[in-house]
């Protein structure tokens, strides 16, 4: 019967539309807050929870200085910076700049970086690419050439091999981070660059 088939079709379409009906904005926001663990009853705890927080933010870039002052503490109770270092050194989490930089002159603190699971870091870096990034300045280029030739180095080794002063090496590393050309195994290396040497209080 044609009328019966039409009714079945109409009922099916109506049911399918109901299943994909948009929710109210407040319900969507409630879902987002829970998904990102920023409500009191969904906040995470402990160092191992970092991988959960990072997974929900993977690929998202934020100012380097905001990760440990705002983003992670909002999601993880009693967050400790050492937790991120431990997860990075254990090979679980990595950090990098993904978007090309217009210049490397901006402060490291405001440089957009992303946290990601280390096992997927190559995928993110491949997607980002380094096309369009400006050339580093002379000192930054010197440091970059040393790292390219020697691989990962301790700061004192890098200072000695580059022939630059410690502050010059710090500034060069900051420029290379801002350009997205270098990163480190630990977040501690980036953390050390967030406050320029010239603005640090003496011990």
Identify the role of each PLM range.
Residues 1-203:
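Long, charged, low-complexity, helical-prone intrinsically disordered regions
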């Amino acid at each position: 019967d044609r009328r019966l088939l039409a009714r079945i079709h109409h009922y099916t379409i109506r049911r399918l539309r109901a299943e994909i009906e948009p929710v109210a904005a407040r319900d969507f926001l409630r879902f987002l807050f829970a998904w990102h663990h920023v409500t009191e009853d969904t906040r995470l705890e402990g160092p191992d929870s970092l991988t959960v927080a990072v997974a929900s933010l993977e690929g998202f870039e934020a100012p380097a200085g905001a990760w440990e002052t705002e983003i992670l503490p909002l999601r993880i109770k009693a967050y400790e910076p050492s937790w991120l270092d431990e997860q990075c050194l254990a090979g679980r989490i990595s950090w990098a700049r993904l978007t090309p930089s217009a210049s490397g002159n901006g402060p490291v603190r405001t440089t957009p970086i992303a946290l990601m699971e280390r096992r997927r870091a190559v995928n993110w870096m491949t997607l980002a690419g380094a096309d369009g990034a400006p050339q580093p300045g002379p000192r930054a280029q010197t440091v970059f050439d040393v790292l390219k030739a020697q691989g990962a180095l301790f700061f004192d080794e890098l200072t000695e091999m580059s022939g630059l002063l410690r502050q010059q090496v710090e500034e060069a590393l900051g420029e290379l981070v801002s350009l997205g050309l270098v990163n480190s195994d630990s977040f501690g290396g980036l953390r050390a660059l967030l406050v320029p040497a010239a603005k640090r209080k003496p011990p």
